[in-house]
Amino acid sequence: MKQAFVDKTVTVAVRDTEVPVPKPGQVLIRVVVSGTNPKDWKMAHWRPDAPPVNQGDDIAGYVEAVGEGVVGFKKGDKVAAFHEMLAPYGSFGEYAIAWEHTTFHLTSKTSFEGGKYEPRELTLRSH
């Protein structure tokens, strides 16, 4: 699969990588829409010694696979999720990994574009 990585000079490189396998409690999502936030390019300045990373955290797409113990989702479900910051396999790729507890179903009337904003908005409203 292809992923976009941002390095410390805020240069984006697209690389071929393996499709990840979800671990227990994780959901593998085939990305349809990915959001971007200021932290996606600022992180390179905040952590200049960090390796290039796929920084995208706002995901909307279809469940491709689930890890052991995941019961609320199955392949083909239309979902949105918040990716764990700084973890591998963010939303700037063909597939992304999210935790089950940060993933939720989208209704048939909810667009992927609208759905991808919900994880961040819910986080902001809870603080």
What are these regions (language model features)?
Residues 4-12:
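Extracellular beta-rich ligand/substrate-recognition surface
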Residues 2, 15, 77, 93-94:
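Extracytoplasmic/periplasmic beta-strand context in beta-sandwich domains
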Residues 82-127:
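NAD(P)H dinucleotide-binding glycine-rich loop of Rossmann-like/cofactor-binding domains
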Residues 18-35, 44-85:
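Glycine-rich beta-strand-centered segment in the early N-terminal region that forms part
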